[in-house]
Amino acid sequence: MVAKGRIIRVTGPLVVADGMKGAKMYEVVRVGELGLIGEIIRLEGDKAVIQVYEETAGVRPGEPVVGTGASLSVELGPGLLTSIYDGIQRPLEVIREKTGDFIARGVTAPALPRDKKWHFIPKAKVGDKVVGGDIIGEVPETSIIVHKIMVPPGIEGEIVEIAEEGDYTIEEVIAKVKTPSGEIKELKMYQRWPVRVKRPYKEKLPPEVPLITGQRVIDTFFPQAKGGTAAIPGPFGSGKCVDGDTLVLTKEFGLIKIKELYEKLDGKGRKIVEGNEEWTELEKPITVYGYKDGKIVEIKATHVYKGVSSGMVEIRTRTGRKIKVTPIHRLFTGRVTKDGLILKEVMAMHVKPGDRIAVVKKIDGGEYIKLDSSNVGEIKVPEILNEELAEFLGYLMANGTLKSGIIEIYCDDESLLERVNSLSLKLFGVGGRIVQKVDGKALVIQSKPLVDVLRRLGVPEDKKVENWKVPRELLLSPSNVVRAFVNAYIKGKEEVEITLASEEGAYELSYLFAKLGIYVTISKSGEYYKVRVSRRGNLDTIPVEVNGMPKVLPYEDFRKFAKSIGLEEVAENHLQHIIFDEVIDVRYIPEPQEVYDVTTETHNFVGGNMPTLLHNTVTQHQLAKWSDAQVVIYIGCGERGNEMTDVLEEFPKLKDPKTGKPLMERTVLIANTSNMPVAAREASIYTGITIAEYFRDMGYDVALMADSTSRWAEALREISGRLEEMPGEEGYPAYLASKLAEFYERAGRVVTLGSDYRVGSVSVIGAVSPPGGDFSEPVVQNTLRVVKVFWALDADLARRRHFPAINWLTSYSLYVDAVKDWWHKNIDPEWKAMRDKAMALLQKESELQEIVRIVGPDALPERERAILLVARMLREDYLQQDAFDEVDTYCPPEKQVTMMRVLLNFYDKTMEAINRGVPLEEIAKLPVREEIGRMKFERDVSKIRSLIDKTNEQFEELFKKYGA
């Protein structure tokens, strides 16, 4: 009997209903007139407490609650791979087709497509005895993964009917099984399974096979086992954000600091606060500018964000740009190839002097701005800021002053003063007279109302050089109006230098010139800022790479070159709007500060002290791409929308290195953003792990990545608070530890159900995002009690450009002894001994560095200095790995062991040489050291192995030289 009740209380995502007699714990119910999806999480008599997976705004007491008789379950069958779901397995692409970009409340859609036909290949025949877990058929779901159709757990008997090879939908019966009781069970290609119940298996195996990732610091020093659990701290601070003083050009507020923009918009929409982060989903999106389809155009910003970062990167360019962003904020580099303009994102912490970043040259758009003509007295005022008014303002801002009721414009060219006077008469109905002053001729106009109008437009009344500002109306005007102002201001010169004491005014000028596609340079001289407008020159250059020959061409030369190779579109469209500015200085500022961001449709916006392209969004892509797991489940749990967008855009672009096919063909994405109801965030973890267990049961090795479990725990905290439960540490529920353990314990390497012997695994890698990088907070501490591997990301290593930035002193793996037999049997019997010896060297280096800080390196004995030399080689030549190099991005196990053997052989020979009296300076000069430094970029393992003989030969020569 289906339970039916009525709502008596609504508190955020929690709803209390009475009249629910007969309902069960964890039963799915439909809530309210809209039929919102909810789950019963507490029963008290006939009252049910329900967590609702959709927004409950507008739901009122008295509305119905109807039970479904089923628990929260997922559909498991062909169609899972390549799909993108929300936290309760609703297919987001299907829902988008139904309701648009936002999920309408109460909308449902089947998780697996019902009309698509799959090619079924039977693997069993009539008369076969089967049990739960047996494979009765296969479906080639993607070009990488074959989907095994299994008998659901709990069903056994004899096959009395099975479909022939052919194409079927998942709703068609493909087999019938007669149970021992005589009941006929119909089997389809999909099954349902409750997410909070782990799928059964025969036996749990010890985690003794490593999950090879190709990352040396992980595989060699802190290995993850198949079926194991690991935690990795997410990005410290607030991700890809900018400094609060960063200027943003908006249609509504003109050029404004992003901090002030946030303060103006804070709370004007749905606001979310989590720890030291807060953001608002705007009711009315604002208009900013961004790069789209080769042009800088108007775009909508839908969210504003504020957080805290533990440090910032400040980048200065040749034209005077100053960009202050978080280390993982992305900027754009680019070059022209035979295929056109290729823009590439690069993290700020990877930018170095000499790099060229894409910056804004020309901003399109603009409209005539209406002027306020109220309270202007006897004069007339134009309705809009037109070309003639812009020209008048240009002359005034360049050579004029406002005094009490008087405007004076100075110039020795009387014809120019007459032009200004005629403009004043035409625009305002007020004229003046030309007089001879001590230092030259001047046009004097006496009109207090006109002074008031001009002051309202932003013309400073006194100390103009300090208070000079570009009128907001002018920044938003079309290019013809801006051109009229600029021509008047610089009086037709091709080169001009404008000196201002106002830093803000100088930067506003750079935006104004960008409306015309004119780039400027800004430099500081004493207390003044010099804005220089020049002809095209060495600054307007294009990085070109055609026929494998990188070049840097001046823009005009590139235009001619472009015609010869068919790239006119690049020259005339894209490169009219952006230029490549050379980086001259990069420095890290290790001070915590507030940071800000806006979310836009193009994932970039124009901002900075001078117009610059800024990205608005740590990934586990490297692990997903290179680990030898066959299926990847990625759960974006409570991530901000722009970060989840990054994942949804980047994953489809990744190629599976083993097959060359898209990585999505072996991936399931679960996208549950922070602005979705917290209850769905809580469910997303269970949805993901259940799908992972299903592929495990087929015999696959599955890697599940949960990003981030900290935000999942925050969802538990909010729900617990609304349930009025006794809070534990920092407000988290007392059962936080058991919930985390329950999730991680579903990982494992197992013998699956079924008549045959089949082994599969689920390896869980959970990202934790401790506020401010505080590893002592409850989520991290409770996670560390459960997981066996901890990869500690180190911000200091990242600042020093050491990647992967995993700290070898604070990370650990409890699987080292478990996987050593696999390494010894399959790769090298001395793997564990070499690994321990290398770790001891790195730990000894850390101890010695403490002494060096006090007394300096020269005070150390030769032997200790030799340890520092070899440990540095270990760090730079082994632990450091280049994810952007096609060879070094993935290091096979055999190569890892060979590289380690080369380095430890060098260490042994170094110690022998020191004992035999060879000076360390001579050892440091050995040519083989340079070859060892390059071995990571060598594919041929035999060539790397040959370095051992070279090392021995060169040391033998040293021994002979010193008679040792």
Curated annotation (Swiss-Prot):
It catalyses: ATP + H2O + 4 H(+)(in) = ADP + phosphate + 5 H(+)(out). Keywords: ATP synthesis, ATP-binding, Autocatalytic cleavage, Cell membrane, Endonuclease, Hydrogen ion transport, Hydrolase, Intron homing, Ion transport, Membrane, Nuclease, Nucleotide-binding, Protein splicing, Translocase, Transport. One of its GO terms (molecular function) is endonuclease activity. Residues 392-518 form the DOD-type homing endonuclease domain. It holds the Pfam family ATP-synt_ab. It is a peripheral membrane protein. GO terms for biological process: intein-mediated protein splicing; intron homing; proton motive force-driven plasma membrane ATP synthesis. It is found in: Cell membrane. Its main location: membrane. This protein undergoes a protein self splicing that involves a post-translational excision of the VDE intervening region (intein) followed by peptide ligation. The intein interrupts the ATP-binding site. Belongs to the ATPase alpha/beta chains family. This is A-type ATP synthase subunit A. It comes from Pyrococcus horikoshii (strain ATCC 700860 / DSM 12428 / JCM 9974 / NBRC 100139 / OT-3).
